[in-house]
Amino acid sequence: MSYRELVVELAREHAEALSDALLDLGALSVSVEDADADTPDEQPLFGEPGLVPDRTAWQHSRVVALLSADHEPAVLLAAATNEIGLAETPQFVVREVEEQDWVRLTQSQFEPIPIGERIWVVPSWHDAPDPDALVLELDPGLAFGTGSHPTTRLCMEWLEQSVKPGQSVLDYGCGSGILAILAKKCGANPVIGIDIDPQAVESARQNSERNRAEVTYGLPDACPDGEFDIVVANILSNPLKLMASMLASKVKPGGRIALSGVLARQADEVAAVYARYVDISVWREHEGWVCLAGTRRESH
């Protein structure tokens, strides 16, 4: 089957409504992009759980709709603009999408990733480049965490240097389970992974089975009582601040905590919240993101 892409550039206030209308009228998928990306006018947009974003699209937005060959792009766009009440149909471009082996194309975009001194994150369709390395087999999926993002890399590097055999580890916000699996491969025991998303929990379980790593996963209400030698949380700054008391309470006195998902400009604010519980500072920065690490005081 052949496909077409309908590309429309328009003002921010109409982007979301047009996207919804195109989907209602039969578009297979719709994405909204910054029409000024890779130019001096590019606008970064960030959002975090617990915060209401100040805007949901770019001032100059590009709507890209994927259509099957039996849809006429001009007719579909005219109907969509009429549905949302635009006075006239915006200018558009139609691009033909060549039929490809999408599985092979997707796989070609993911190569083994070296991390730290001896870690490789390897998709299942690749062989490990170094047979003596500490290998995590992980395919890209729905849950966050494949080692490619700076925050995941920072946490993995910290765990590689910090985990001692037999230590207990809690990975809070485990996503794909990559950090919990690494902790287990570094000798930690027991290892617990917690995530608010049931789909992430299931994905993490499958990844642990594939890597023959015994990790216990669950939702937040299944988080065991007690304290851990190491707590790691790669989430985002706002949830980290909201959960500071709870996360710090999970660290044994003298135990260690690592936090990421934090932009460099947010580091001082997050550290200030945790400072009442732990001695904490920026451990390392990479591509504008930081990993904060610290030790829980003997009493607080």
Swiss-Prot record:
Pfam families: PrmA. S-adenosyl-L-methionine binds at T152, G173, D195, N234. GO terms for cellular component: cytosol. The keyword Repeat does not apply. GO terms for biological process: methylation. It is found in: Cytoplasm. One of its GO terms (molecular function) is protein-lysine N-methyltransferase activity. It catalyses: L-lysyl-[protein] + 3 S-adenosyl-L-methionine = N(6),N(6),N(6)-trimethyl-L-lysyl-[protein] + 3 S-adenosyl-L-homocysteine + 3 H(+). Methylates ribosomal protein L11. The gene is prmA. The keyword Membrane does not apply. InterPro entries: Ribosomal_L11_MeTrfase_PrmA, Ribosomal_PrmA_MeTrfase, SAM-dependent_MTases_sf. Keywords: Cytoplasm, Methyltransferase, S-adenosyl-L-methionine, Transferase. Its EC number is 2.1.1.-. Belongs to the methyltransferase superfamily. PrmA family. It is an enzyme of class 2 (transferase). This is Ribosomal protein L11 methyltransferase. It comes from the Bacteria.
